[in-house]
């Protein structure tokens, strides 16, 4: 963790980091397990895996907060971009080299493919951060098509309305309409 906390440099800090990692991993495993249970016709078991996964998510959040891991949106976007940068520039490349050295060429290739995805994630977070920092999330210098994420109302203009005229949801529900079909 990059931020300084009252735990910085202590064994307790290491324990908090381990608790966060463990709870985060457990959450993911339980969602994967729920999917298998559901496919095999065990709805109750799937539901219990998901409920437990939600509990684990909250436990992880509690420990992450102790580590000052959650900031405002701009801080979170920067932290996310930096994390993605580390993943694609260092982590996955190192993993790929090790896999190649050990003869796992297919896995090395997969590590590099995922690294390319992580690069895209970094670019996306940095673009969103620029929008937040320049107050261009809901306002642009050129005409855009804005869509309400709640009801689908379309507005054409340089900025999203303060309130959706159809469903009365706030501006925060608007995004630039994406046509990908």
Short names for language-model regions:
Residues 1-181:
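Non-heme di-metal
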């Amino acid at each position: 963790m990059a931020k300084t906390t009252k735990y910085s440099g202590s064994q307790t800090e290491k324990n908090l980091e381990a608790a966060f990692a463990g709870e985060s991993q457990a959450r993911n495993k339980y969602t994967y397990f729920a999917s298998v249970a559901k496919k095999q016709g065990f709805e109750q078991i799937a539901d219990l895996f998901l409920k437990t996964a939600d509990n684990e998510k909250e436990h992880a959040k509690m420990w992450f907060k102790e580590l000052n891991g959650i900031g405002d949106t701009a801080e979170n976007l920067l932290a996310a971009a930096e994390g993605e940068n580390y993943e694609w520039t260092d982590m996955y490349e190192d993993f790929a080299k090790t896999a190649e050295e050990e003869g796992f060429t297919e896995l090395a290739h997969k590590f590099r493919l995922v690294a390319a995805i992580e690069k895209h994630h970094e670019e996306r977070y940095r673009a969103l951060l620029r929008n937040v920092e320049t107050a261009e999330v809901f306002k642009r210098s050129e005409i855009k098509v804005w869509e309400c994420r709640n009801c689908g109302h379309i507005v054409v203009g340089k900025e999203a309305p303060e309130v959706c005229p159809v469903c009365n949801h706030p501006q925060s529900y608007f995004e630039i309409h994406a046509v990908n079909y």
